[in-house]
């Protein structure tokens, strides 16, 4: 170790390195080797929950545990400590006369943050706390940095997000939140697998951004000397698989959008997209409701979900309303009536709804009214369907009113949780929609996409009537963990 580096270390770090060297001198690897446990902390608590101090003493049972040393007290020949493993904490009771002088020194010199293995007798203290009375201590790994002060609840937000490992060590609530996230995703998989869906993987690098309205990240493939984009959706590749005959497919994966960051947006996030042949958007509404209710029940049990003090009736049938009806109910404006673009713009001006340069159809105005007046009112789970064709380039037109599509979005607590539709499988109509998107892009719409001719070719081979769905996994995890910022459900959120 260089002198320069030593000078950068604080006193505690220097002492810990000295202890590391001392372990080596004793023939002990400071960073340990394989260690076999017989139980974790929770398994022991569950197994012996109904046994008191005397009953445990009479059973004379032993266990071998391992974990991070997070508390330590005592002096002389007796010490108490807590080890933390994935499931929680358990106390250890160490006596010099039980483990021997040399072994006791390992415990005595261990620092908070070190990993220890402990063999011993399962017991209860006079206070009733389940503990392991050590018969042997094994040093497993040396922590060369001390845990943060007040590590029982790390509170510095920057540290929490930049050094998630410290947050996981320090905040059990945070640790459990990410365990819950994992369970939510596992249960969604289980639900779809049981319904005959195949989980598939599609490319992250695309030649052309598509499947959503979003600005992509652009990268360059050196070997082929071509620009590529990180995917903004998995949609178009998954629908190619429907063309190929897979019939029921889904993908859970990372999506990348080169856009702003706020409480519900991160440049990379996790979504699930699901496609089902021979289905329409009504079938997908039922599927969406089932997915979300199953996920909620798996982590919250039966009944409603409490989110930031509001009771969300996620266990009841979700409300369903047409976008035009929702706008009319709140504003009195009736977009069922036929009108020109100029008439729609005049109504927008009267209601002080901003009109962007790329609003070239009445449908753009309708969507702007919805975003301005309706979204903020949608607290309970609500399917809003019937989006205008102008803002739904991949959705099938409604056969009864071709200004609108067989599309829906799911809203909960004013936020969009899912987007779905009866998929457009007419390649000629799809090409004209792509061309309209390309024109909007030229007019300054950063979220409009170009034309994916390969996808058009795939459709020309024939795609069966299909329903498709996308759900933002992170927002769903926020809802089911009562979290207000997406950074609290992403292990490693994007930071400046």
UniProtKB/Swiss-Prot annotation:
Compartment(s) where it occurs, according to its Swiss-Prot or TrEMBL record: Cytoplasm
Cofactors (names): Mg(2+)
Reactions that this protein is recorded to catalyse: tRNA(Lys) + L-lysine + ATP = L-lysyl-tRNA(Lys) + AMP + diphosphate
EC number(s) given by UniProt: 6.1.1.6
Keyword entries, A-Z: Aminoacyl-tRNA synthetase, ATP-binding, Cytoplasm, Ligase, Magnesium, Metal-binding, Nucleotide-binding, Protein biosynthesis
Annotated Mg(2+) 2 binding sites: 416
Name assigned to this protein: Lysine--tRNA ligase
